[in-house]
């Protein structure tokens, strides 16, 4: 337990330089891009006096040197102040937090749907290796991996919302019903990828000596499958889930934009479009934290499931 605690502490400390490095790079890239946030704000208001533009730029601190701007933002971050949105004039932290429930709901539903679909089908395909079921599921996996998410989203919207009128076209991010189409869109793509990986992992395990030996001793295949093979395959499944959870918690920009799902992905797209620097930086910090924490939890689960896998802690 002591080593595990030390490892967790070490990884959390590593989060600090990671966040600093990523935020500095994103801050620099936004400035290098040359776009003017103030001009974006006044772009649809016709001719605006240069004095007004200069005053707004000074108010936002955009007339300061790059390092001064970054230092000011970093100082605010360390005191819990992520600034004010250039576009809405609202507190960035409060706005960002208000979008998290919609993203969390979509993440949970998508992961549940993916697990329910991909793991049983992947195992089934492996057990029925080189039979009709296997060929059919492999075709489904290939098709799901080939179709872009936006195409699947538009197809589902056309069928379920416009043609059959079963589900709302525009999601409001507050009900399960409005989450069905974006969840299906994400689950189809992830299930196609996961099913192929689960099939390959389970098939590899089924051909190992301990499984063949159990079969020779008369142990039922179903018993070996559920007690040994699936447990050995869990590391691969956990890796896939961890990667997907990280990206989903960051918001899926295209899907959220298509379905008008009011989550952090759509918020990030809108912020980038309007050059809302404080909001973009908040999103960058969120993504950095999420990926470090997801990787940390994954490493710990690896160690719990298979103690032979050593954590990155020096022997005492």
Predicted features, each with a name:
Residues 2-14, 120-156, 235:
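Cytoplasmic-entry segments and transmembrane alpha-helices of multi-pass inner-membrane transporters
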Residues 2-5, 96, 100-133, 172-316:
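Alpha-helical transmembrane segments of integral membrane proteins
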Residues 18-71, 165-181:
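Hydrophobic alpha-helical transmembrane segments of membrane transport/permease proteins
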Residues 33, 144-147, 249:
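Transmembrane helix irregularities
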Residues 57-66, 82-92, 174, 272-278:
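Membrane-interfacial helix-loop-helix junctions in multi-pass membrane proteins
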Residues 66-109:
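Individual transmembrane alpha-helix segments
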Residues 89, 138-200:
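Membrane-water interface segments at transmembrane-helix boundaries in multipass membrane proteins
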């Amino acid at each position: 337990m002591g080593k595990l605690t030390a490892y967790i502490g070490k990884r959390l400390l590593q989060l600090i330089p990671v966040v600093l490095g990523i935020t500095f790079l994103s801050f620099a890239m936004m400035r290098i891009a040359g776009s003017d946030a103030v001009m974006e704000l006044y772009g649809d208001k016709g001719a605006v006096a240069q004095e007004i533009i200069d005053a707004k730029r000074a108010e936002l601190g955009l007339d300061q040197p790059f390092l001064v701007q970054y230092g000011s933002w970093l100082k605010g971050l360390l005191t819990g102040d992520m600034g004010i949105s250039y576009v809405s004039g609202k507190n960035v932290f409060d706005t960002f937090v208000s979008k998290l429930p919609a993203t969390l709901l979509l993440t949970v539903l998508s992961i549940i749907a993916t697990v329910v679909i991909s793991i049983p089908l992947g195992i089934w395909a492996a057990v029925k290796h080189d039979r009709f079921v296997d060929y059919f599921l492999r075709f489904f996996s290939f098709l799901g991996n080939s179709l872009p998410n936006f195409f699947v989203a538009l197809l589902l919207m056309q069928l379920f919302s416009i043609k059959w009128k079963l589900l709302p076209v525009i999601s409001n991010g507050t009900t399960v019903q409005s989450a069905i189409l974006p969840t299906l869109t994400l689950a189809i793509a992830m299930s196609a990828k996961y099913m192929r990986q689960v099939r390959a992992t389970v098939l590899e395990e089924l051909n190992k000596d301990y499984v063949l030996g159990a079969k020779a001793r008369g142990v039922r295949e179903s018993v070996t499958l559920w007690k040994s093979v699936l447990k050995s395959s869990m590391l691969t499944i956990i890796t896939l889930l961890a990667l997907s959870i990280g990206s989903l918690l960051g918001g899926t920009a295209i899907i959220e934009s298509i379905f008008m799902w009011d989550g952090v992905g759509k918020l990030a797209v809108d912020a980038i479009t309007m050059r809302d620097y404080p909001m973009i930086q908040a999103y960058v910090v969120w993504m950095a934290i999420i990926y470090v924490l997801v990787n940390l939890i994954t490493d710990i689960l690896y160690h719990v499931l298979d103690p032979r896998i050593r954590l990155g802690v020096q022997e005492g």
